[in-house]
A protein has these predicted regions:
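Generic short amphipathic/hydrophobic targeting helices enriched at N-termini
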Residues: 9, 14-17, 180, 188-190
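C-terminal single-pass membrane-anchor helix
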Residues: 197-204
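Short, well-ordered surface patches within globular domains
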Residues: 23-86
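Disulfide-stabilized extracellular recognition modules
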Residues: 81, 87, 95-191, 203
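Classical eukaryotic N-terminal signal peptides for Sec-dependent ER targeting/secretion
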Residues: 1-11, 192-197
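Second-shell loop/turn segments in exported
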Residues: 22-26, 42-49, 90-102, 135
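N-terminal signal peptide
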Residues: 13-26, 204-207
């Protein structure tokens, strides 16, 4: 790690709490965990559980991003846990235009809902990584077992909100077979297709 990076990183850690406010991580994680698991059930993925290490990492990064919008370049890419295992990551940002109308609050499921909307960009018939569906695929990635989220606010005139979620095991492994095994088509859609073919078979035998 270069001396320049160390200085930038230490400066960010020392002063971020002055310029950004970490929001209640217990409430944030309670809400976002429930919404993650709601969507995962729809894709036959097991429920996630909260992880304190991931929560701390996410909260620190959210505070850094809220304080300094170019913190992406300050933090090293490919965040890892204490065992040096790569983590998945989703980031949500919004800026309140009106002072009395915040774009986000800690009881909101908006970050996960916005990430999940990327399902519309994913082609289940050709499984694989695309940048415009990567938030969605991480949410429903079947092998992922843990999540931890953090939210922070830059309390200035614009009120910049940042929400970060980290995941273990990381999703979005660049292998089509991994996507095929981990990103399962919406179970509701599957039931519609099965019911359609069942109806066709019934009609075939009747007539």
């Amino acid at each position: 790690m270069s001396n320049v990076f160390k200085i930038k990183f230490l400066y960010l850690i020392l002063f971020k709490t002055i310029f950004s406010v970490k929001l209640d991580s217990n409430k944030v994680n309670e809400v976002l965990l429930a919404q993650h698991n709601k969507y995962r059930k729809m894709h036959n993925a097991p429920d996630l559980v909260l992880d304190n290490e991931l929560i701390k990492l996410a909260l620190d990064y959210a505070a850094a991003l809220a304080y300094k919008s170019d913190a992406y370049s300050t933090y090293p890419s490919g965040t890892k846990n204490k065992n040096r295992e790569r983590l998945g990551e989703n980031i949500f940002s919004c800026i309140s235009v009106l002072k009395n109308k915040p774009c986000y609050d800690i009881t909101s499921t908006k970050p996960v809902d916005e990430w999940y909307k990327e399902i519309n960009n994913y082609n289940f018939e050709q499984p694989g990584f695309t940048i415009d569906s990567s938030h969605f695929t991480q949410i429903v990635w079947k092998e992922t077992t843990k999540v931890g989220c953090g939210a922070a606010l830059k309390d200035d005139d614009e009120k910049t909100y940042k929400v970060v979620c980290y995941y273990y095991k990381a999703g979005n492994i660049l292998n089509p077979e991994k996507f095929k095994a981990n990103v399962i088509e919406h179970s509701y859609k599957q039931r519609i297709i099965m019911n359609y073919f069942s109806l066709v078979l019934i009609l075939f035998y009747l007539f």
